[in-house]
Amino acid sequence: MKRKPGVRELELGAASAVPPKALPLPPPTGEAMAMLARRGLRPEKTTGDLPFPAQLEEHVAARLSEWLGHYAFRLFLRGAIQKPESFLPVETTRYVALERSTEYAEASVDLGLAEISSRGRYTLKYPARSFGGTLEWYVGRELARRFGFDVETGVKLHVPGLGGDLDVVAAAEGKLIYLELKSSPPRNLAANEITAFCDRLNLLRPDLSLFVVDTALRLSDKILPMFLEEFQRRGYGISGKKRIAAQLWALTPRIYLVNGSRDLMMNIGKAIAAGFRALAPEVL
């Protein structure tokens, strides 16, 4: 049997070892990123995929955020992004009347997002690949503005086997909140996206997590059953599942399913409030 090294040999070996190199990453900025670092992760902020400059003047950002609070405007902008060459207002979405979509196109010009090209057509000045980055920007900004969270969006973790970025992470009251945002309608969501979300929860262990689908459609038809099936496959308990409001579900006291019906940020706020109450100590 091979002899184990003694105390002296262990100490000599450790003392003669080459000092470890410092990680080539800047220190985390903000409490949300610091909480990820304390979990042994290497969070890195990515460049946002936005149809506007990342550093907007505050008065422009405030007006844009106000427009994004309208579900119809989000539908319009999502459709405009899908037509990078040029678009007519009526081509952006079939769910918004021509008069309103024209108003949104003119607002986009006023905000500096678009310009008039020719024959009533418009072109986005800063093409984006999808609406996802804009949704992250809006939700992150409103979490900070309305609730005082420290927020980061589009965070890469450099973890093998864990694809994609963290859409939104937020910190307050010593708690870490993770939000995954989906800008596609429920019919476009696949089971592997639910699986990936649960994998991220296992890695992050956030105090509170929200799976947010920016749609007015019912989540109980497809998305909720997909979550229950995934939870059952993983052996998670689902006895605590309950509806908090219309299409706002508490899958567990820490995991919430949210849609964008009527007021997206109000729905997110309700889920956060329910989660914070569930995590709070008993009064008596």
Language-model regions: role of each:
Residues 1-284:
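Intrinsically disordered, low-complexity Ser/Thr/Pro/Gly-rich regulatory segments
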